Each structure stands twice: as structure tokens, then as C-alpha cells.
Amino acid sequence: MTLCFVTSISCCTSAQTFTLTSQDLSGQFTGKFIANVFGCTGGNKSPQLAWNNAPTGTKSFAITMYDPDAPTGSGWWHWVVFDIPANVFDLKQGAGNAAVQLMPVDAIQSLTDFGIPGYGGPCPPENDKPHAYIITVYALKTAHLGIDKTATPALVGFIINQNLLAKASLIIYSKR
């Protein structure tokens, strides 16, 4: 079962709402976006994402994918990307795989809770409640966060929040 919700939060007044969309996530994760670990046998491709109406002053973007329902006591970070140039407004399907080089120049994918940089698809435990997968794009007031691909999700999140102008999210629920 997969449901999709869209949310947007802006730190400043704007005539247009900062939004995040995906041509790939129109109601459910398909096998190509599911992880290929922990008993899941998906294709582990990151979804296509697009955003628009970034606030004035945006100098870069960051993207995260987070599962707050993971049975860890602290959730699970599936994807962390930052230093996406301000003139980029989408990521192609599969951009989360560094080997295919679809990520914009200068963008950095840092460590996830899988212990490596790059996209790690959803794979909730069997027979668990539906998990929320929150994909968020952040409009930032700095061009570079000043960290590299070895940064932990917590450190990236801290620096993102210090530089936040606006954010928009997709929330997808998935159950195995």
C-alpha cells in the first residue's frame, strides 16, 4: 500500500508556493525504486524529482529522503544530497546512483544510514505498519554547505537548517 502527500513550508512570505513533484511517485513505489537489501529485491533507482517557485535569494538546493518509522529509535536516512546549484530544478530518475553520473555538477551525495553515499530505496520490515518516506527539497541561502560526502545525515541536516529559506516535501507510505 502506498499513499502520497505533498507539503510545503516557507520561511518567508512569497506569492507562489515552493513545491516538489515527481513523475515517478504518483501513488506507489514500484519495484525499480525499492531497495535491494534486507530481503527486498528492487532496482534501487532514485525517483525523478522536480521543484519550482524557489524563493528569492536561493543559492542552492538540498534533498533528503527519511523514514521516521524505521525500527531504530531514530528513523532511517535513505538519501542525502546537497550543493545542488540554484539553476537546477530537477533530478532525473536514477540520479542517486553515482556510477551513472546523472547528478548535477557540484552536487554532493553524502552518507546515508546504509553507510554509503547515494540513494537507498525503501524496504520496511515485513508485516510492519506502513512506513512514511519523506522526500524533502530545501531552498538554501548558501551555494555550498562546506562539507563533503563523508558528512553524516545529522550534520547535513544541522547545516541545512542553519541556511534554510524554504522546503517542500512528498510523503509516501509504503508497506511490505
Region locations from a protein language model:
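Bacterial N-terminal signal peptides
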Residues: 1-10
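N-terminus-centered regions that define maturation/targeting leaders and the start
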Residues: 12-176
